[in-house]
């Protein structure tokens, strides 16, 4: 069933990234080697000196970290380079989000009513598409994109359940995506989620601001 298809999808992604998961191979293209990995090591050094990583003394004679969204200070996978061997923890920040992308696409396809194999295909085609693979060197754009299917799923949950629980799930997904530091992708995710909600819960035969469509906008905004 769907569990077997999801497991097969996760194994497919793992097979694609096996060298990065099982060997000492590192990521290096573009800003990875020149900007983001050095910053991860610098903040790890700050932490090991017993200081909070809110100021980076190694860049530009010192610069604030919390004011620069490119540090992703509040995003959980950023911390992997601080608690694991830095090179491995740092590349996990990238690789784990391909798993998130695949899983999110899979669950979104399942929510749309597709069977196990079509869900597998949806996840595989999305995660291995050219545009997605090309994000593999973007420290913030990859994680924010990885959250897009999950933000849509959270919006769908909000439409079905409503109340504080539904709003909380949607707000949590959107907040984590915002912590990944690329706000334009978050804006696009909200637009995509609203489109999903109108397709599955709206009424194209009713006036735009009436009936089911009005309920969609009201519940969406309340989340």
Give residue ranges: language-model regions.
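Membrane-interface starts of transmembrane alpha-helices
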Residues: 1-4, 85-93, 114-122, 166
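Cytoplasmic membrane-interface regions of multi-pass membrane proteins
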Residues: 204-209
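Polar helix-capping/helix-linker motif
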Residues: 1, 129, 210-211
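Start-transfer (signal-anchor) and selected internal transmembrane alpha helices
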Residues: 1-18, 215-222
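Short, charged, surface-exposed loops that flank catalytic or proteolytic processing sites
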Residues: 163, 210-213
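Membrane-interface coil-to-helix junctions
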Residues: 12-105, 124-149
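Membrane-embedded helix bundles of polyisoprenyl
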Residues: 9-12, 99-112, 116-203, 219-223
């Amino acid at each position: 069933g769907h569990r077997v298809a999801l497991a097969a999808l996760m194994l497919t992604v793992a097979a694609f990234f096996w060298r990065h998961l099982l060997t000492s191979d590192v990521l290096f293209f573009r800003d990875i080697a020149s900007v983001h990995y050095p910053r991860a090591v610098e903040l790890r050094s700050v932490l090991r000196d017993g200081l909070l990583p809110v100021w980076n003394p190694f860049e530009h004679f010192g610069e604030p970290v919390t004011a620069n969204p490119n540090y992703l200070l509040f995003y959980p996978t950023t911390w992997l380079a601080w608690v694991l061997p830095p090179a491995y923890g740092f590349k996990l920040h990238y690789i784990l989000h391909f798993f998130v992308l695949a899983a999110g696409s899979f669950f979104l396809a399942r929510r749309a009513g597709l069977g196990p194999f079509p869900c597998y295909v949806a996840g595989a085609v999305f995660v291995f598409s050219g545009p997605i693979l090309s994000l593999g060197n973007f420290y913030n754009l990859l994680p924010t994109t990885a959250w897009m299917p999950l933000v849509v799923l959270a919006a769908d949950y909000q439409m079905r359940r409503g109340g504080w629980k539904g709003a909380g799930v949607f707000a949590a997904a959107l907040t984590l995506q915002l912590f990944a530091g690329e706000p334009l992708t978050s804006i696009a995710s909200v637009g995509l989620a609203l489109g999903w909600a109108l397709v599955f819960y709206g009424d194209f035969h009713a006036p735009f601001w009436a009936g089911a469509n009005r309920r969609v906008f009201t519940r969406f905004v309340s989340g």
